[in-house]
């Protein structure tokens, strides 16, 4: 029914995670227009070092999450950075961090980072710690080596195929919109996050974005934003983990979920590589030049965002 699609679109657009992305516009206000690849805008910035491309990125973790679950926040700090590096088609090399809080909070954060470091096979090589009795903060930063052309959102273009690559094994947290897969996926996650660099090096995929705090459709809108491409997504084409509602899945931060684009004819190679690792591959359609991200139930269609007149990040 059309009213259900309208309600779904309204729920997505009004979610705190989507609305929070609008604050990124202050970066443009201060630093000026972004070229997306070497400035603010993409999942990571590309820095050329000795003829090699290095991806640099960083993440700040929600203070309320650090207070509630410092160990989980430490895990998330590594996860978010590793996924950002992967989304650029790079192999993660190292993590550094900044931690502020009471002694036991800092210990729990670092223990979470140590756990995730082992899971993803990425060392935590340094950082900064400030002991504070009444303040908590956590940020982490990563570098990665990009062996091929970066999977930048600037490479998104009409005619490319769009797919969701994801791990559907996991359990949704009750307190925060996170879908961890560590118990279910374990050490396979280290290879999972390196898959995108392999697909990029083989020329299979053109661009990518990890599904993060903006949720599935917010992340997709951000992928389409720099080149003003459009897409029509059939809601029944989106795979959803068992025991999770579509609405919760659409708004959560999964442990492993990436939106990827590729040239027509590359879908089979991408699918084989993804499913060969036991991950889910879901084709979501073909990108167009409309600048509109639309949702459809195959009978009715609603516009979630028209990037010709609206913006997600303001960059």
Where do the PLM segments sit?
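Extreme N-terminal cap/leader segments of soluble proteins
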Residues: 1-66, 88, 97, 107, ...
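Acidic, Ser/Thr/Pro-rich beta/coil linker or hinge segments at domain junctions
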Residues: 2-4, 275-315
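A generic local secondary-structure boundary/capping motif
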Residues: 34-36, 44-47, 83-84, 114, ...
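General beta-strand structural signal in soluble alpha/beta enzymes
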Residues: 36-40, 55-57, 123-127, 142, ...
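Glycine-rich anion-binding loops of enzyme active sites
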Residues: 53-56, 61-63, 91-175, 286, ...
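Small-aliphatic-rich amphipathic alpha-helix that forms the alpha element of a beta-alpha
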Residues: 69-95, 108-119, 192-200, 216-222
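Active-site-proximal betaalpha loop/short-helix elements
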Residues: 104, 186-255
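Short, compositionally biased
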Residues: 174-189, 277
